[in-house]
């Protein structure tokens, strides 16, 4: 499934956030850009929470977002935090989550450190899992 964005524009009064945005996105995809580039606004448009000033968006199904602030339980490990949102007993996901964290270069920290001791980048990667 693709999301097709054509001639998208978003203005807030006189401030132009983006204009003439043409983009085709194949799932799964990650939206990554520096602060202030309109990522959150674009996601809000895709989720139907914010109308565009002009342009069209087609093919939007389910949209997920990872926000800039993590919402981790500080006393749990990264693996325990990731398992909180999954249905069923957390133990059934342990091996799969360990593999996910290993792919992110966090295999040791994900099991050993409480979230309060993770770096900012490790916390954001935990939120992605």
Where are the regions that the model predicts?
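Conserved structural motif at the start of ABC-family nucleotide-binding domains
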Residues: 3, 16-20
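ABC ATPase nucleotide-binding domain signature
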Residues: 34, 63, 67-71, 76
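Conserved ABC transporter NBD signature motif
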Residues: 54-64
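Q-loop/switch helix immediately C-terminal to the Walker
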Residues: 76-88
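Conserved ABC ATPase "signature" region
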Residues: 93-109
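Conserved ABC ATPase signature
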Residues: 114-118, 122
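ABC ATPase nucleotide-binding domain "signature" region
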Residues: 126-129
